Amino acid sequence: MDRRAAIRLIIPVVTFALTLALRIHGIDRHFWMLRDQIRDWTIALGPFSALPLVGPATHVGGYTIGPAFYWILWLIRVLVGPWFDNLPHGGGIGQAMVQSAADAVLLVAIWRRTGSLWVALASTVLIVTAAYDLALSALVWNPMMGAALAKMATAMVLVGWPSRSNAGVAFTAALAWSAVHCYTGAVFAALGIFVSIVAGLFARGDRAGAVQSAVIIAAVVAVLEVPLVVHQMSSASAPPAMGAVTGSVGRILSGEARPQFAASWQGFAGAFTFIQGAPWQPGWLIWVLAGSALVVLVKYRRDPALLAITVLPQILAIAGYAFYVGDFLDRYYYFSLMPGAVLTLVLGLTAAPSPRIAQGIAAAVLLVAVAITPARVRFAATMHRMPEYGWLLDGSKRLVERGHSVKGIRTQFPLPLSADPEFLYRILGGRIDPSAEFTALLTRDGQVAYRK
């Protein structure tokens, strides 16, 4: 293997290892184990045949439109779970592995697409070390899985696999639509990916290939929606999958409400500023992105495939979320847009007429990204951490070692409302028996006391 090939192999491998270590550091002491994580990991602990035909419930009612999240989580439980006693933080490690694999693939894809290692590294560091993303990326949580799959599908487009084979089209489409299965907010990234595949072929003059790819994409989406159709046909009383979305659109189309374009822009701007700007959150950051988008639109106007995975998903999201009526959206709705947004930012900043100047700017952006990483990592450590998890784990292990059943488990320390002090104990093989004589009391130092 020559030196150049070795470098091209080592860099993504190191990227995977470093980003994974960053995400899972201390996870067995602070894993965020609330209602959603308990529900989804409980499902993953069961047999594949018992998995739901639809995705997790949403906080606005209904559920996501397919079971891909549960398929992947079940596979994580089978492959990764046994190494960690099938405890839920093992699921978090598995999900972090998916995220880090997506980061490594995206780095390679940007490198190949732009021909610049500096652009690839700068983009990857900015995406990976975003504090809010870092805080959530090792959870058992469907929005983050959706973001990871959308990231992988974006990478497939950047390396041009869909333009070279029908298998590439089908695989990329399946990844993109599985991201929507995991989290509906990924639909804008998925649509951008679909447009990129078809528009790229049209731009090359391959109209037959473009039409064929569109048919393949439609077929993949149709096949992936079969579980939803089966679920709805077998559950006559089941609510619609995305009732809040269809209800909002219906109210606007009927004239009962108006699209909220200003609120949608503010939601996107606030999310981008927080995700990419925290802990500082400078108000000017969104305008740097907007300026970069204009530069990218001009410079790459003859490259619709690239524009469709960078600028288009952001435009679609701002327009699409304007048709949502209700309290506006949480920042995590926008995670799947961040790879395209960051790549837009970096490509815009490095759009110099001279390649040497462009490379110098990219190297400078990388230096800035590396310089702000420690502050971002520190800020991430202040969000979505549950130190009680470590205390629950220590006490549950000690209780199981003693080998007798208990009436229930209580804690000497307060827990978040939706946490379950008995969940880890049950996974480890402990028995809850209502007729048992004692209730166990877990303490902060991992000790166990008994109360009648």
Feature-to-residue mapping (PLM):
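Signature aromatic-anchored transmembrane alpha helix within multi-pass, membrane-resident enzymes
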Residues: V13-F16, A218, L349-R378, E388
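Transmembrane-helix motifs of polytopic, lipid-linked glycan transferases
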Residues: I93-T114, L149-M152, S292-K299
